């Protein structure tokens, strides 16, 4: 094993995760219909600061992400600073790493802390699948630009006369990979076939996710980390995630038809995560700064790793690539972990990554390692359910996972937790967190 790379500042401080908070996650076009991601981000950051009693001027940097960006406000981070009463001098910039966006935001703030340029910062992400940048066709877009340059009315009319009715149709955001044309669900189908994952296995994992998430809410385990959200038209609050199937049976999952490969597929809407609206954020500080303010950190960031693989085949294997690297940098093995939380983009993707982590052959032939990362103990895995149940506002999921894992590790007496995710573009992310 390579030498561990401790995440500490120049003064020897650990990177403390002081607190975290999220909105409830809502299925597309439900409770947050019409609420843009910026407003969701302002909602969660404002509430988190109010709950923590941390003066806004203590926060020196805010790094936030949004995957489905709105052209009228390309820097969501700065808009959150300006819209929550924080100091106008607070540094703020936005990041995007697809489904691992808030992992990246956390890493960026951690690096600023280690460099000594700040002592406290906020990281997070927000996305809305209900407020989308609906565009225009390329033909219409080019015509509008040319018309803006035209000098006479006749020149403009000539340009517009070339348009056809189809050119006037709205264009929704792309759901396929730009480089390959493959949808995420197509890749999930690839992985199900490559790794021999059956429809029954996928449905069972999805059912487990919903059962455990419902149980977590029933037992009050999530109440401290999920705010009550009031969204226009303010008729009723949203207190819990509204995607969780509390009373479903395994037989219910078997009724759905494949969503991507209609003839031979096994990936359905029920064993995939849905389009979701929501926001999540965490406050990070140097350990000494937290002590100065009299704060008990929720936990600490021990290590992180980002990886990238080919996009044409099984590109959602990011966790299988990034996990061994994050463990190595933390000086740990899979057996040392108290909990493991893997983003469930699809049940097929999740099960494929679990197979790869346990495979000596994958370790040798693909990763160039001598042995497998290890077989994941089910009793440690996604113990409160996962993204299939909670939903997946792309940029918010990582911050949700970090906060949720740290709370649960602390409830279990402390230890280490792994949070890991795949992302579009063949990207992967993994972080080791620690709670005492």
Swiss-Prot record:
Its EC number is 2.3.1.16. It is found in: Cytoplasm. GO terms for molecular function: acetyl-CoA C-acyltransferase activity. Pathway: Lipid metabolism; fatty acid beta-oxidation. SUPFAM superfamilies: Thiolase-like. It is an enzyme of class 2 (transferase). GO terms for cellular component: cytosol. Keywords: Acyltransferase, Cytoplasm, Fatty acid metabolism, Lipid degradation, Lipid metabolism, Transferase. CDD domains: thiolase (cd00751). The active site is at 99 (acyl-thioester intermediate), 392 (proton acceptor), 422 (proton acceptor). It comes from the Bacteria. GO terms for biological process: fatty acid beta-oxidation. It catalyses: an acyl-CoA + acetyl-CoA = a 3-oxoacyl-CoA + CoA. HAMAP family: FadI. Belongs to the thiolase-like superfamily. Thiolase family. Heterotetramer of two alpha chains (FadJ) and two beta chains (FadI). Catalyzes the final step of fatty acid oxidation in which acetyl-CoA is released and the CoA ester of a fatty acid two carbons shorter is formed. This is 3-ketoacyl-CoA thiolase. It comes from Klebsiella pneumoniae subsp. pneumoniae (strain ATCC 700721 / MGH 78578). The gene is fadI.
């Amino acid at each position: 094993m390579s030498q561990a790379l401790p995440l500490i500042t120049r003064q020897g401080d650990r990177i403390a995760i002081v607190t975290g908070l999220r909105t409830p996650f809502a299925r597309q076009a439900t409770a947050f219909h019409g609420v843009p991601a910026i407003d969701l981000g302002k909602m969660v950051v404002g509430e988190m600061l109010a709950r923590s009693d941390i003066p806004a001027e203590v926060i020196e940097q805010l790094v936030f992400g949004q995957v489905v960006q709105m052209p009228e406000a390309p820097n969501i981070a700065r808009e959150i600073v300006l819209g929550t009463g924080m100091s106008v001098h607070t540094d703020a910039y936005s990041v995007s790493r697809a489904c691992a966006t808030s992992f990246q935001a956390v890493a960026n703030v951690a690096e600023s802390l280690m460099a000594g340029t700040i002592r406290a910062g906020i990281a997070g992400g927000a996305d809305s699948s209900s407020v989308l940048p609906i565009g225009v066709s390329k033909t219409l877009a080019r015509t509008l630009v040319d018309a803006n340059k035209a000098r006479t009315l006749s020149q403009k009319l000539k340009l517009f006369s070339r348009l056809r009715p189809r050119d006037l149709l709205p264009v929704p955001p792309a759901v396929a990979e730009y480089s390959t044309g493959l949808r995420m669900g197509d890749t999930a189908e690839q992985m199900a076939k490559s790794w021999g994952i059956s429809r029954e296995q996928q449905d069972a994992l999805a059912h487990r996710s919903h059962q455990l998430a419902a149980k977590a809410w029933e037992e009050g385990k999530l109440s401290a980390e999920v705010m009550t959200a009031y969204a226009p038209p303010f008729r009723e609050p949203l207190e819990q995630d509204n995607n969780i199937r509390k009373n479903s049976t395994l037989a219910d999952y078997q009724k759905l038809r494949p969503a991507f490969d209609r003839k031979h597929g096994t990936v359905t809407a029920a064993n995939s995560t849905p389009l979701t609206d929501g926001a999540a954020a965490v406050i990070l500080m140097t350990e000494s700064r937290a002590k100065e303010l009299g704060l008990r950190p929720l936990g600490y960031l021990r290590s992180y790793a980002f990886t990238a693989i080919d996009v044409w085949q099984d590109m959602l294997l990011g966790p299988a690539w990034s996990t061994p690297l994050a463990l190595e940098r933390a000086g740990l093995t899979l057996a040392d972990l108290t909990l493991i939380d893997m983003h469930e983009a699809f049940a097929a993707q999740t099960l494929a990554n679990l197979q790869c982590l346990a495979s000596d052959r994958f370790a040798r032939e693909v990763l160039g390692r001598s042995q497998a990362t290890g077989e994941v103990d089910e009793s440690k895995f996604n113990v409160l359910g996962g993204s299939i149940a909670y939903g997946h506002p792309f940029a918010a999921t990582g911050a949700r996972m970090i906060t949720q894992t740290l709370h649960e590790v602390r409830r279990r007496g402390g230890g280490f937790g792994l949070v890991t995710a795949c992302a579009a573009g063949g990207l992967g992310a993994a972080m080791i967190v620690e709670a005492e």
